[in-house]
Amino acid sequence: MIIAIQTLIFFRQSLLTALDRLLRPYFQKFALSLTKSSFESDDDEPDENVFAEYDDEKGVIFFPPMYVQRYAAIVDCLLDERWSGKLDKVVDLGYHDMSFIKYLKEVSGIKSILGVDLETIPLQCSSDLLSCNEYAPKRETPLQISLLQGNAADPDYRLIGCDAVIAIEMIEHMLPHDLERLVHTVFAFIKPWIVIFTTPNDFKDVITGDINICKFNEKYLHRLNCTTLQVKKFSKTTQGLMAKNKVDALVHTREVVEEIKHLTKMLNFNKSGLNQQDEKTHIWYNFNWGENAPYWNQYYKIVREYNYPFETKSDDCRILDLISDEMNRLIDLQYDDILSVDLNKLEIPLQHLMQTVQHITDDVENVRELLEWNGYEVVDDMVIYSRLAIDNVTIDSQIDDWQENESVSDVKKFN
């Protein structure tokens, strides 16, 4: 009986290894198909983890927090196909603790970010969050972040050339006479491609044609830091601009935004005629200025500036880096033991890898030739990634290192 048990224990590992060799390829294909379908379903289906609930003491509680959902909605606007990758310079008015600039600097294509705030203490306390020391990973494109102190209504010359203007929860804190100056500074002085204002006020739906776009319910007045006169003043000033600008409604996929539509609304003023503009010609250009901009308009004070290190790479190098990172991610997802020589191959659909480089190219044949030229095996639109050679080299190198260390220790011991 004991001999039989020992025999079963001896052959158990061999049996499991054989079954793993037979079933692992089918499991990998099935897992990759599930992974691919999950990526595709993320854009189509709403996130079930986004919801809101009511608490008797705290009121409405949002998951994730409301400011995170608002930031996500603004980023969705900036990633619109009409100007995605074309926004070189962006200004965030009233950024306070720089919580949104941390998201803004990850948007592709942006090379310059301006932060303007009237308060000095939050600027000095929060500016260390954007530290870019020598240990930070290098970016693909240059990025400069400038923190400025001043009134957002002042037409400072550094605002010239901004492609996007963002003001999050700011207009309800401004004085009535500054609101009118702000509108003229944004739409008459800067003249960006896109302007985004957010406010906790209960706006009427812009698409319905109601001109009182900033009218809100009286029961929410005690929660705001502004008066009815301030909001109506801003609304009255913007009414004259609606005839010259195309107003788009922000359609957000998250259901919670629809449920709390009476609490928050975003105005996205898209300057008409964007497609007709020459990309090489600045929209802010005024022929009365000539070639020199009015640099005498120095209203803001520089608090701090950051220049992030960057490394210029070719498109082929960027494609290879992104594909390599995606392969490593899938390998770490599939393999439990990276040193196992039994799990020696992984087949990755080429179409799945194209999703990671779609912002660079959509030429499948070019990517296929690039992978084959760099040593990857592509068979029937499947990239064959083998780790057998890598694992053998790793194991052998470790054994050699151990042997060398043992020999050296022996020599030292006997000497």
UniProtKB/Swiss-Prot annotation:
Q: Where does S-adenosyl-L-methionine bind?
A: S99, D117
From the Swiss-Prot or TrEMBL record, give the protein name.
Small RNA 2'-O-methyltransferase
The entry marks the following residues as binding Mg(2+), namely E169, E172, H173
What EC designation does it have? 2.1.1.386
According to the UniProt entry, its GO molecular function terms are: metal ion binding; RNA binding; small RNA 2'-O-methyltransferase activity
Q: Which reaction does it catalyse?
A: small RNA 3'-end nucleotide + S-adenosyl-L-methionine = small RNA 3'-end 2'-O-methylnucleotide + S-adenosyl-L-homocysteine + H(+)
Family under the similarity heading: Belongs to the methyltransferase superfamily. HEN1 family.
Q: Does the keyword Hydrolase apply?
A: no
Per UniProt, the keywords (alphabetical) are: Cytoplasm, Magnesium, Metal-binding, Methyltransferase, RNA-binding, RNA-mediated gene silencing, S-adenosyl-L-methionine, Transferase
Any single GO BP term: RNA methylation
The protein's role, per its UniProt record: Methyltransferase that adds a 2'-O-methyl group at the 3'-end of piRNAs, a class of 24 to 30 nucleotide RNAs that are generated by a Dicer-independent mechanism and are primarily derived from transposons and other repeated sequence elements. This probably protects the 3'-end of piRNAs from uridylation activity and subsequent degradation. Stabilization of piRNAs is essential for gametogenesis.
Q: Taxonomically, which superkingdom? A: Eukaryota
Cofactor: binding details? Binds 1 Mg(2+) ion per subunit.
**Might you report a single GO cellular component term?**
cytoplasm
Subcellular location(s): the record lists:
Cytoplasm
Tell me the cofactors it needs. Mg(2+)
